[in-house]
């Protein structure tokens, strides 16, 4: 939480903020449109995200970390702290004619509502989309408890129990019941379980060097609404705050995008304390598309000497007529000048300038 507003250098830009004054378009994009993980109980805390799609889209090229960052390469280290780089990160500003209309975007289901931003710019309704919106496909998968956590419990359902059962099979202590569409949890303490990732369809071939991303979403029904609920996937936390919390976060759908290491086919799921049910599970596996000049056709070269205060200046050589895209949250008070002439600004990617 301490890092939400912290920068390491005056020239650094960040995607997180903790403030009562915020850009509503950006917050809606994070929480509703795109669907980022929400690790904090306070709705005002727009966290640093570990979602690799969001990081690429927002141009997060560098991460400072005390441990390895999947998808990023170490470029410098000072004692335990390293600087990690991802050359696939999007430019902060670029021009393109590879677009998708908002109408088409709004039809996309999870996880394509996230990954579309790596292949198209989403623009106004009056523009025709490019290439019938052809996108990288992701394979449906299922998650099953590893064998060492399974115990038969009738009708094929499985339960992992910590504690005792009485003669009426009433479960006490901590237990996790695997249901057809999710899990039912009664945890008096935090419990970590390993799950295997299984292909639902015929297994697809992964090209060497391509890192896999597990996209996971499920609904949370909290049986004790006056208590927080948290679930970690490979250390990535989502939290639903107690309903009576003054800054209740309304995070009733937990969404994750989990980078996997090469050859990794299991995940660690940590169930937080509480009594709750996780249902409507959606899980997909696949690799992100390579950084493409088809989307990032012309990149802005920022003039650091002329860029200061609330003004950014730079040059761009536009190859095709199209749209100017940034990762700056949209606001009606921005002004844009091209070759010295003021140009009308529009909202792109549903929330950006």
List the predicted regions and their residue ranges.
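Catalytic cores of secreted or luminal carbohydrate-active enzymes
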Residues: 56, 79-171, 277-292
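Extracytoplasmic/lumenal acceptor-recognition loop(s) of multi-pass membrane glycoenzymes
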Residues: 2-56, 90-115, 121-122, 236-237, ...
């Amino acid at each position: 939480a301490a890092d939400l507003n912290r920068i390491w250098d005056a020239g650094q830009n960040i995607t997180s903020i903790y403030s009562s004054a915020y850009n509503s378009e950006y917050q809606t994009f994070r929480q509703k449109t795109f669907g980022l993980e929400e690790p904090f109980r306070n709705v005002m805390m727009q966290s640093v995200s570990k979602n690799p799609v969001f990081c690429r889209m927002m141009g997060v090229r560098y991460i400072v970390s005390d441990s390895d960052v999947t998808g990023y390469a170490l470029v410098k280290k000072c004692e335990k702290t390293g600087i990690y780089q991802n050359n696939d990160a999007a430019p902060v500003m670029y021009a393109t004619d590879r677009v998708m209309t908002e109408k088409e975007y709004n039809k996309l289901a999870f996880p394509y509502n996230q990954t579309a931003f790596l292949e198209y710019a989403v623009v106004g309704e009056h523009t025709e989309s490019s290439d019938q919106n052809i996108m990288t496909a992701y394979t449906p998968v299922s998650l099953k408890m590893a064998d060492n956590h399974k115990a038969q419990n009738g009708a094929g359902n499985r339960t992992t129990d910590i504690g005792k059962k009485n003669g009426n099979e009433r479960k006490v202590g901590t237990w996790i019941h695997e249901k057809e569409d999710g899990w039912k949890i009664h945890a008096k303490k935090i419990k970590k379980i390993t799950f295997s990732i299984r292909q639902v369809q015929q297994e697809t071939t992964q090209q060497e060097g391509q890192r896999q991303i597990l996209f996971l979403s499920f609904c949370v029904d909290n049986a004790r609404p006056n208590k927080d609920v948290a679930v970690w996937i490979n250390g990535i936390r989502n939290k639903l705050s107690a309903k009576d919390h003054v800054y209740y976060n309304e995070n009733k759908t937990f969404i994750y995008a989990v980078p996997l290491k090469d050859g990794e086919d299991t995940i660690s799921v940590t169930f937080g304390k509480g009594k709750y049910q996780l249902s409507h599970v959606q899980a997909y596996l696949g690799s992100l598309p390579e950084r493409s000049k088809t989307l990032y056709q012309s990149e802005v070269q920022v003039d650091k000497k002329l860029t200061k205060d609330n003004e950014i200046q730079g040059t761009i050589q536009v190859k095709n007529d199209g749209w100017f895209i940034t990762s700056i949250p949209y606001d009606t008070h921005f002004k844009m000048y091209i070759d010295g002439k003021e140009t009308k600004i529009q909202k792109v990617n549903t929330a950006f300038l």
